[in-house]
A protein has these predicted regions:
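Terminal alpha-helical segments
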Residues: 1-108
Length: 108
């Protein structure tokens, strides 16, 4: 976590890009898990979900860093990239919550 009192809009944007990148990689893994289920390749699902979770953990840590800075009263000039990152992260977390259910439907 940064010790600066105020982060620049560019710094915050870079954190937003990281959240987009890691949650985007997680989303890709989760969608691939669903495709594997569709093809009957159920043995690949757990590894893909594990990979997704690792990326989500990193993205979530970045989000937590921003929340902690906000709670400390730091001035955060939040731009659209950070908002986009938050959207990516939350929708991917939702996808992870339901991916096993979707795969189970294909199993039947």
């Amino acid at each position: 976590m940064t010790d600066e009192k105020n982060l620049s809009r560019q710094d915050i944007g870079m954190i937003g890009f990281e959240i987009v990148a890691y949650s985007g990689d997680a989303r890709s893994s989760l969608l691939e898990a669903i495709k594997c289920a569709k093809r009957g390749e159920f043995d690949k699902i757990d590894d893909l979900v594990k990979d997704a979770q690792e990326n989500l953990n990193i993205a979530h840590a970045k989000q937590t860093e921003m929340l902690a800075l906000d709670a400390q009263g730091k001035d955060l000039d939040i731009g659209f990239i950070m908002i986009h990152g938050q959207d990516h992260l939350m929708t991917t977390m939702l996808l992870k919550d339901i991916v096993y259910d979707i795969c189970e439907i294909y199993k039947k």
